[in-house]
Amino acid sequence: MNPKQGHILYLHGFLSSPHSQKAQQMQAYLALNFPHIQLHLPQLSGKPAQAIDQAERVFSTLLQQYQQEFLGVVGSSMGGFLAAHLLNTISAQPKAVLINPAVAPHRLFPDYVGEHTNPYTQEQFSLEAADIRLVEQRYIASIGQPQQFQVWLETGDDVLDYQLAQNLYKDSECHV
């Protein structure tokens, strides 16, 4: 085993995809600077229940397949929420980098109830009250192992309040 081999799971945000600018920039950066790191970019459903299930399955599979290699998680927006959920419920072994993570998406989703089409994949889905309740059940009020998280926050995000993330991850390495 080459100890430098590693894997990063990238979890995109709501109504996004592995084809988003952030995901593509990360893929290009790793290919150029860290070719020994394999980036895993699953396409997550817009439906929260399916996205959570997909993220859990991919994460668990990577943990099993690459037990002796580095595994990290990067999550952007809703993907940041999912990354925190994975580390808090399945395994806190990996480290995570969160980019403007959604902290309480169940508080934002009421504004998104209804029909949606993912602009990258053309997936059509409906966000319903049951989806919001499911996400609320996975709300994380405190971080068990804050040293596992590095958080990058942008103050000018139109949707996400960076101060919520700054407060939740106050004991983690945060960059505003």
Where are these regions (language model features)?
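Glycine-rich phosphate-binding loop signature in dinucleotide/nucleotide-binding domains
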Residues: 2-3, 62-69, 90, 144-145
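Residue-level signal for short, function-critical loop segments
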Residues: 14, 77, 155
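The alpha/beta-hydrolase serine catalytic core
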Residues: 94-176
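Conserved alpha/beta-hydrolase fold motif
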Residues: 72-73, 96
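Active-site catalytic motif of lipid deacylating hydrolases and related acyltransferases
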Residues: 6-69
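Active-site signature of alpha/beta-hydrolase-fold catalytic machinery across serine-
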Residues: 85-89
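Gly/Ala-rich beta-loop-alpha elbow adjacent to hydrolase catalytic centers
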Residues: 74-83
